[in-house]
Regions:
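Short, surface-exposed loop/helix-turn segments at secondary-structure junctions
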Residues: 16-20, 49-70
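Structural helix-boundary/capping segments
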Residues: 3-30, 38, 75-131
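Short glycine-rich anion-binding loops that position phosphate/pyrophosphate groups of nucleotides
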Residues: 8-9, 47-50
Length: 131
């Protein structure tokens, strides 16, 4: 969405915007590759705070900022999964993100499953059976 939102599909825009965005994406992927030389997984926040209350009224820029912790993983092409990791004092869930090496989705999913199980957060909707 960053590339499409910035670039117009013309030959001059292609060189200016698309190629530059592709270089930045490669730099981000390279940084993750270097990080994974030192570890198997990265665990980090899924967001800058708790989940939003239903009545939250944020500006478009504030909503965009909520993606801050997830954008790099998407650009790098590495698997990442977010899970509830606990509850904040205000009663809203906190999310944790597990990031794996490229094509090592299963390892990230396994750790994410353990984090969710041990967090004690069960946010599955209650099923109400009709008569």
């Amino acid at each position: 969405r960053m590339i499409i939102g910035t670039a117009v599909l013309s030959s001059e825009s292609y060189d200016v915007y698309f190629m530059q965005a592709a270089r930045v994406r490669r730099l981000i992927a390279d940084a993750f590759n270097r990080a994974f030389e030192m570890c198997d997984l990265i665990v980090c926040p899924a967001g800058a705070g708790t989940a939003l209350p239903l009545d939250s009224d944020l500006s478009p820029l504030e909503y965009y900022a909520l993606d801050l912790f997830t954008v790099a993983m998407n650009l790098a092409g590495v698997p990442a999964v977010s899970v509830p990791a606990g509850m904040a004092e205000n009663g809203l869930p906190l999310g944790m993100q597990v990031v794996g090496r490229r094509f090592d989705d299963m390892r990230a999913l396994q750790l994410a499953k353990h984090i969710q199980q041990f967090s004690g957060v069960d946010n599955r909707p209650t099923v109400i059976m009709g008569e």
